[in-house]
Every structure is written in C-alpha cells, then in structure tokens.
Amino acid sequence: MGATSRVVINNMSNNDLVTRTLLISQKQPGFIVVSRGGNNNLDEATVLSSGLSQIRAFNLANLTSISKPYDFETSGRLLGWGLRNSVGVAEHPVTGGIYSVENSIDGVTRQGTDIHENNPGEELNFHGYLNDTTDHQGGNYGFPRCFAVWDPNEIPDNAGLTVGTQFAMTENSTITDEICASNYTSPRLTFPAHQAPLDIKFNADGSEAYIAFHGSFDKTNPVGYSLSIVAFDPATGEPTEAASSTTALSDIMTNPDHKVCPDKCFRPVGLAWDSKGRLWMSSDSTGEIYVLQKSTSTPTATASGTIVTATGKPNAAGTAWQKSTSALCYGAALVVGGLLMAM
C-alpha cells in the first residue's frame, strides 16, 4: 500500500470464495457496495453475525482522517444475505436500484435423486436502493437452505414448485418448500443452472443489463460461455420479464459448439464500458479482450467468424483469435483481435 492508502473496510477474510466485488455508487456519491461470498462451513452462512454470504453498503463520506475502518460483519447497510457468491453487482443508471447475479451450488440431490443437471438456477437478485428508503433490503436469499427452481420437473415431490420459486434441498421439521417460499427472498429472475454469471453492467439508459456467463463445469451438456442481455424498463428499473420467465436472456455473443467447452471456448468474465459507449469483455481461459459496439444498421439474426491462428503471444494486443466463435448480435458490431466485423 502507498503512503496515501488506507483501509476503509476490514474483517472479511474467507477460506473459500475469496474475491470481493466492489461497486462505487453513481447515484449516491460516497457509497461503496461490497459483495462477500460464502466459506467452507455452510452453516456459518445461516448466522447473520458471521458476515458471510452477504452484500453490504458503506458510506465512505462518513469517514474522517482518524476514523477506524468499517467492520464488515457489524457495520454498513445490509442489502442482502444468504447469497452464496454474488460476483456481479450493478446499479441501475436511472433508478439507482442495486442488482446482483448469484452463482448457486453444484451437486444438488433431493430425496436421493440427483437433480444437479438443471437445478438450482442462477439468480438475478434485487437489493433496493442506496437512498433513504430501505425497501427490498436486508432479506435472506436462501443459501444454504433454500434455492431457486429452474426445472421443476427434475425435482421429486415438486407440488407447487415453479421457475423462480425457492425450494429446500432437504426438507425437515424446520425447513420446507413452503417455508423457503414464504420466509426467504426469491430472485427477480432465474437463469439456467451452472451458467456462472460473473459480471453485470447496465447500458447508459438502463434498458438492458449485459451479463457475462463464464460457463459450466458440472454439467453433462455445457451451458453458458456467453454474453447475454436482459431487457429492462428504463423508467421503473425492473426487468420486463416476469419472475417465472424462462426466456429473459438474449444471447449477444456465444461459442458455436458448447460440446467442446470449456477447453476450446472463450469464457466471459469482466465487463466495462468505455467513453465511446463500447462494451469491453474479457475471457480468462483464452487471455483475450472483446470489444462490442452497437450499430445503427439493420441487425441480422446471427453472424459467425473464423479466427486465424495468432502469431504473437496469446495475450498480446492486436493478435488474432485462436478459437472459432459465433456472435449472435442484435444491431451490434464486434471487434475481434483488432478486426471490426459488422453484424
């Protein structure tokens, strides 16, 4: 740390899921949102005072030059808990609503039946606003007791279960599907299981949320490995699809053959807008950067391109891509390895 650096939040070490997502609010200056994932001991996530599996907001404007750091476990505003690993966090540019994308668990069984192929679903969760209202804040989103349904047909004893409702992995006297549905906060939208959303960014007018899906590792037929959008109502800051929707995602860019994933696929991770309104996307598996820019021309349904073998280092600027990719574009243009491909 440099001479002018200081610790503003402490006490959030984990043995597992060690990354921390930080969001600086543009609607409420001075606020920082911090997402902290779970630990090895699942039971600890059921205790609010543990500070695990939580998203909290802190007002840095309240810190003076002699203030002690905020204690993550006891300070700040609780936006939500029971969140296993909400890596992507974003603020709606119009309403200031805070959203996160949740990576749910793997290897789920129920009543001795393996249901992990299509359950539980990944989640888009809403956490209220950073202004004076506390509506939709502080709720328990279920982990590690309750999870979101994606495919109810795969779940034994599924009466009353629909897409997006909460279900109990193991029902007993203290936790049932009914308790999960009534006492825990369900996601605003649910996505297919194991897609692994790692980032979310809104466009400037708040009409679309772009989500980077890193892709599955625990599924017979790989899913994810894509950049997708969710349509929003800019005025309300709400998704246009209902919470039970199975069609909320529209793929913008995806690998052409998921059967060869993850070894021969790009895997989206981080997203960032630049001053020209272009969306930059990183792929950790291939060390590459994509740049997407909207076009005013009439969109085509799909477009694809074959990338020649790179002649330099895989992560060198301007090198061509080593993988064949397909882009599903809606009025967009794609820059790949320095080459602009109009879609």
Describe the role of every protein-language-model region.
Residues 1-26:
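Asp-box/WD-like beta-propeller blade repeats and closely related beta-sheet repeat scaffolds
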Residues 3-8, 65, 75-77, 245-250, ...:
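Predominantly a core beta-strand signature of beta-propeller blades
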Residues 12-21, 79-82, 191-192, 259-266:
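Short glycine-/Asp-/Thr-/Trp-enriched loop segments that recur within the blades
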Residues 30-34, 98-100, 209-211, 278-281:
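Hydrophobic beta-strand segments that make up the repeating blades of beta-propeller
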Residues 38-40, 53-73, 84-85, 90-254, ...:
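Beta-propeller domain segments
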Residues 120, 269-301:
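Blade-level signature of beta-propeller repeat domains, shared across WD40, Kelch, NHL, RCC1
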Residues 296-318:
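C-terminal low-complexity, Ser/Thr- and acidic/Pro-rich disordered "stalk" regions positioned immediately N-terminal
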Residues 315-343:
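Cleavable C-terminal sorting propeptides in eukaryotic secreted/cell-surface proteins
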